[in-house]
């Protein structure tokens, strides 16, 4: 059997859950207080770094839909309040086609672009 990332893809279930929580806490730390869109969303749901202690707790986080993101972009053009870093940290910009309404604009950092590439690697392996 071929693997794109053998260590990750063969990790025991308990280790996967621990990694998921570790990654969530890292993401939360980077977003909360920096990204106005998600800070307001977490505050409204009373979610903080202590709320999520295991993967089951993630269900408490409110989902985000495209309409919310487009509304944020209309209120604060062109990218809305869903930016975590200064504009200079972003290396790419793309947008959806807008076939279901208005196009959604998305900024990528070099790290997020690399993540998308890794997703492709998992799919193609």
Can you say where each PLM-predicted feature lies in the sequence?
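Nucleotide 5′-phosphate-binding alpha/beta core
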Residues: 1-95, 101-123
